[in-house]
Amino acid sequence: IMSDFDSLTFIFDEPSVGLHEREKEKLIQVFQEIVAAGNTVIVVEHDERIISIADYIVEIGPGAGAEGGKLIFQGNYNDFLNCKDSIIAKYLKESNYFIENYKHHMDTAPILHSDNKLCIRGANINNLKNLSLSIPLYRIVGFAGVSGSGKSSPVAHTIVPKLKQILRNRVI
């Protein structure tokens, strides 16, 4: 079925919950196959391994509830690890979980043209105020942050409705 579709956006909200490490590797392989078929994968996730394979990372935070809702970071994994404002990056860097074991592939990814991005400007959703970000298409995009920080809000209340609006009159 995947060979019949391209230019679709697949959204997963914490798909690794309860999975064994071997199952997570299979999940990652599925994400990569979806992208290789010309689609976009957006993942809201806490798992270090899943975050590490994202071509582009968006972190919302810094805390939960009223302490969250701010854009902390957007960019590639290597830059993410060096983000001083990121609680998640600090944990990953201090745990040395991926730095030695995985060479991230964003450095070799082609530069995307502006028409290959989904842009959100000035979104106000739940505790997110005036959120603006650009999400590259045809990549794996990870949304990270502590529980309750607002990771799912831009996906569920902005990206999904906008994609529905854009695709309403298109036959797929």
Per-region residue spans from a language model:
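Conserved phosphate-binding elements of NTP-dependent enzyme cores
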Residues: I1-I172
